């Protein structure tokens, strides 16, 4: 071999060594990775494993050797850096395994590095010469299923990125199943503990399966509640009430929990009322042939800054109309109180400057035919329960806004519903009558009749109180057919009505009348005890004797009888009574001799109705017929059964008169329970009005009747009931107290 051949051989050997060295130090090819969504992370920004290693390279790290081709100083990294490095390296190697076609048996620098950091966990059954070096990042193609099941499931799930979504869903389903079974088991244990202690189980979610047969139909159901009355506080007033969930299901964040209210009542000894009843259902669609509408309508959803001129402009095309603002509308319109609140709020000031800050107003037309014309221009939902929709124009600074408002008219025939028309002649028993308050404007007498009958028992008659425009004021009276249903309603105290249109908490109270004490039978009754152990009328002395015992654990709250409120709590003359007295002096002198025996304007807490017809107004709580004339104020208080001392022969009947009687009302501003005090005083806003029924002027001039000056005995009084029992005005009119027929007994 010559020298040239040796030189060529050495050169070839050097080239082979160089190639082998290059092959050893060759950088892995670039990986084309698609973004992998995993645990809220995307694939790392480095495109190759080399870039990733270079990112974590330390400046003072040891240079690579032949044994370890790529030493990046992994031991010098922090724990967080190690975890991040391994997580990103997993993503790259999984992608490289799928995209690169390198033989798996060929070890790579990354594989050798990971093998040193995270050693593989081989089982004794696995073949030692297995070619799967990346089994911790993916499932092996040569490993058996039994071996896969024995591996660590947590590490396998976290490393198997290609099947991550499926594993996550399976894990979520299994967790939900475990949680639901755990919660169900804990609930059963909790119920056992609560039942053993005898305490109610609060449930925060309404279970509609509890009332499979809801009393939503306004027709009388076949399984009507039992008519019997139970005096036990543990039993429910009605068997049907057990089907409904408690009020806790519908308690909002701003509403007081019924459990707190119940505990408060128990701490203060008020055990007179049971838990509230609940009624679920829908209002039936209304269908009238030739209805007679009230001249007053409710307009809801109006802009809070709308003006009276804009309302009249929108509704004036149907006829002359006036706007009645919520609250004391007479005071705001007349300008008697134009003082705005001190806080200067624009929304609060609009109420005092004649604007609707509450979002609703009342429109009053001169003719009821204008209401019918308005409804022809309104739209109505199919199967609506009495609500209509009308578009009004609201003027803005730079444009005109078209707003759709809600219209709720009222048909005058919906104010009363009786199953038997003979009740108009025979009259209604007040001892089976309850007062209901806080009624919604869409609840007619027939709807209230069906609701009360579904919940408590058979109902004879329902009448809603109306104002001088025959529009409901939110209260009424319900007469039951049996005493058992009456006691159930009184013991319940409140009734929750839930419909798709509204939710209301209706108040139920006994309807009181003027009578004698049921203990001594000599003094006039001063108060009424609604506790089921008493449930009778008391005078001052009998109440002190019967309820002054210290050993009685229950607190019996007295409900003041309206006719005795003035006598029990006399006070100085108020501005209201002074105005009433001054107004009474303005009456004509023709009736002065008759009117001197009866106070024309008693205080609001002592309503008197004089000379009421025995078979018309007195029979149905003072129901006003269409032919009778109503003067202000808006509220008409019904007459009640006369006092026991009154004899039937002393009553005066007006049914024989040809002309309808004239009705005179107290001109003092009187408030319904939905309104506030008119004179600005801090008194509560629950007053009664006083009404007087006197014969027409032609009565005394007829040949069969003497003149008014020849009447020796005054007319007999009839008493109306207080709207909210228990409220006692702190100051009463002294003339009403002295001129009371029961005063001085």
Swiss-Prot record:
Ranges annotated as biased composition (Basic and acidic residues): 162-175, 264-276
Residue stretches of biased makeup (Polar residues): 219-229, 241-255
Location of region: Disordered: 1-45, 94-180, 204-283
RRM domain boundaries: 297-319
Keywords tagged on the record: RNA-binding
GO cellular component terms listed in the entry, alphabetical order: cytoplasm; neuron projection; nucleus; synapse
Feature: compositional bias, Low complexity: 230-240
One of the GO BP terms on file: negative regulation of cytoplasmic translation
A GO molecular function held by the record: ribosome binding
Transmembrane intervals: none
SUPFAM superfamilies: RNA-binding domain, RBD (SSF54928)
PANTHER family assigned to the protein according to its UniProt record, in alphabetical order: CYTOPLASMIC POLYADENYLATION ELEMENT BINDING PROTEIN CPEB (PTHR12566), CYTOPLASMIC POLYADENYLATION ELEMENT-BINDING PROTEIN 1 (PTHR12566:SF9)
Function statement: Cytoplasmic polyadenylation element binding protein that binds to and regulates the translation of specific mRNAs. May not be required for oogenesis.
Protein's name according to its UniProt entry: Cytoplasmic polyadenylation element-binding protein 3
Species assigned in the record: Caenorhabditis elegans
Gene: cpb-3
């Amino acid at each position: 071999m010559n020298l040239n051949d040796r030189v060529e051989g050495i050169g070839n050997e050097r080239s082979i060594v160089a190639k082998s060295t290059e092959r050893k130090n060759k950088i892995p090819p670039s990986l084309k990775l698609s973004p992998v969504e995993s645990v809220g992370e995307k694939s790392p920004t480095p495109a190759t494993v080399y870039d990733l290693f270079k990112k974590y390279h330390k400046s003072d790290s040891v240079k690579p050797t032949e044994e370890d081709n790529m030493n990046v100083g992994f031991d010098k990294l922090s724990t967080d850096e190690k975890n991040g490095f391994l997580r990103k390296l997993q993503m790259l190697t999984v992608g490289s395994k799928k995209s690169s076609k390198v033989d798996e048996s060929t070890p790579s620098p990354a594989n050798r590095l990971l093998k040193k950091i995270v050693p593989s966990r081989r089982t004794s059954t696995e073949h030692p010469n297995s070619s799967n070096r990346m089994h911790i990042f993916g499932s092996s193609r040569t490993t058996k299923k039994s071996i896969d099941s024995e591996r660590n499931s947590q590490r396998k799930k976290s490393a198997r990125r290609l099947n991550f979504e499926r594993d996550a869903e399976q894990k979520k389903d299994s967790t939900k199943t475990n949680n639901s079974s755990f919660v169900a088991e804990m609930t059963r244990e909790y119920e056992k503990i609560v039942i053993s202690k005898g305490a109610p189980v609060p449930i925060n979610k309404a279970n509609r399966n509890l009332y499979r047969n809801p009393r939503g139909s306004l027709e009388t159901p076949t399984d009507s509640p039992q008519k019997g009355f139970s005096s036990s506080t543990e039993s429910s007033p009605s068997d049907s009430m057990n089907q409904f969930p408690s009020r806790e299901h519908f308690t909002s964040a701003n509403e007081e929990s019924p459990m707190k209210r119940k505990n408060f009542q128990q701490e203060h000894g008020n055990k007179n009322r049971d838990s509230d009843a609940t009624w679920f259902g829908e209002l039936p669609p209304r269908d009238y042939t030739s209805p007679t509408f009230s001249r007053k309508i409710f307009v809801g959803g109006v802009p809070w800054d709308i003006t009276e001129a804009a309302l009249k402009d929108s509704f004036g095309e149907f006829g002359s109309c006036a706007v009645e603002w919520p609250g004391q509308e007479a005071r705001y319109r007349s300008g008697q109180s134009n003082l705005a609140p001190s806080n200067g709020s624009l929304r609060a000031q609009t109420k005092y400057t004649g604007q609707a800050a509450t979002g609703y107003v009342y429109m009053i037309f001169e003719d009821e035919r204008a209401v019918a014309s308005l409804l022809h221009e309104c739209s109505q939902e199919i199967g609506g329960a009495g609500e209509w929709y009308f578009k009004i124009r609201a003027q803005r600074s730079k444009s005109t806004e078209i707003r759709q408002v809600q219209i709720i008219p009222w048909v005058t025939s919906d104010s009363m519903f009786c199953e038997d028309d003979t009740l108009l002649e025979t009259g209604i028993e007040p001892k089976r009558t309850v007062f209901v308050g806080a009624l919604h404007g869409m609840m007619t007498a027939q709807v209230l009749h069906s609701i009360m009958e579904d919940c408590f028992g058979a109902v004879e008659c329902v009448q809603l109180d109306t104002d001088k425009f025959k529009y409901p004021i939110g209260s009424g009276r319900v007469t039951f057919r049996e005493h058992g249903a009456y006691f159930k309603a009184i013991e319940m105290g409140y009734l929750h009505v839930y419909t798709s249109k509204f939710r209301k908490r209706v108040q139920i109270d006994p309807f009181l009348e003027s009578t004698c004490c049921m203990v001594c039978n000599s003094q006039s009754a001063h108060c009424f005890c609604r506790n089921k152990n008493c449930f009778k009328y008391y005078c001052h002395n009998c109440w002190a004797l019967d309820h002054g015992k210290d050993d009685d654990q229950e607190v019996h709250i007295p409900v003041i009888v309206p006719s005795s409120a003035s006598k029990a709590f006399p006070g100085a003359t108020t501005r209201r009574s002074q105005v009433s007295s001054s107004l009474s002096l303005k009456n004509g002198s023709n009736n002065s001799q008759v009117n001197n025996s009866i106070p024309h304007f008693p205080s609001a807490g002592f309503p008197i109705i004089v000379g009421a017809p025995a078979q018309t107004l007195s029979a149905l709580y003072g129901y006003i017929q269409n032919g009778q004339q109503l003067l202000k104020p808006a509220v008409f208080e019904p007459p009640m059964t006369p006092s026991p001392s009154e004899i039937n022969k002393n009553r005066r009947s007006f049914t024989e008169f040809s002309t309808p009687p004239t009705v005179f009302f107290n001109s003092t501003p009187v408030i319904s329970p939905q309104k506030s005090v008119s004179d600005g005083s801090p008194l509560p806003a629950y007053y009664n009005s006083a009404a007087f029924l006197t014969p027409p002027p032609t009565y005394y001039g007829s040949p069969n009747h003497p003149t008014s000056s020849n009447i020796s005995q005054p007319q007999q009084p009839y008493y109306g009931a207080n709207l909210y029992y228990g409220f006692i005005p702190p100051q009463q009119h002294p003339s009403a107290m002295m001129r009371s027929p029961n005063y001085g007994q």
